[in-house]
Amino acid sequence: MDIAHDLQSIGAQEQALVFPHFDPARAWALGNRMHALATSRGHAIAIDIVTFGQPLFYAALAGATPDNADWVRRKRNVVAHFRRSSYAIGLRMQQAGATLADKHGLPVAEYASHGGSFPLTVAGAGVIGSITASGLPQRADHEFVVEALCAELGHDYAVLALARS
């Protein structure tokens, strides 16, 4: 895995995966799409869609644990704080040889810079929330969310996917 290349690709994902508008009905549709995709693949994950301050969709699939819910919360907090994907922030920390606690004073009990939470961005409004998955390895969590967003927004996932490591 080339961190610099992944960071560039994640930046392109974040720029491309923007909703023209977003409301609870769209959250429900996206959440159900993610649930169906995860179920078809046998993923034991938790899925979470929020606007900051308001939960819109949550599902824990068979095999997901309460620990996944806590990872969701901590990853979501990273997106809320930085307005970037949790995986991008984690890769930046890895590049710097630092942690969120070291560099930003953010407690590990509240923030997890691991892949899986992606900014929910609306054209003209910016980042208004997050879409999060937890239960797979962090890169796979990130790509699961990106793949679902591509399908929801009509983008070609093959174009936006991270390079295979």
From Swiss-Prot:
Coiled coil: none
Pfam family, one: HbpS-like
Gene3D superfamilies: Haem-degrading domain
Family (UniProt): Belongs to the UPF0303 family.
Official protein name in the record: UPF0303 protein Bcen2424_1558
Taxon lineage: Bacteria, Pseudomonadati, Pseudomonadota, Betaproteobacteria, Burkholderiales
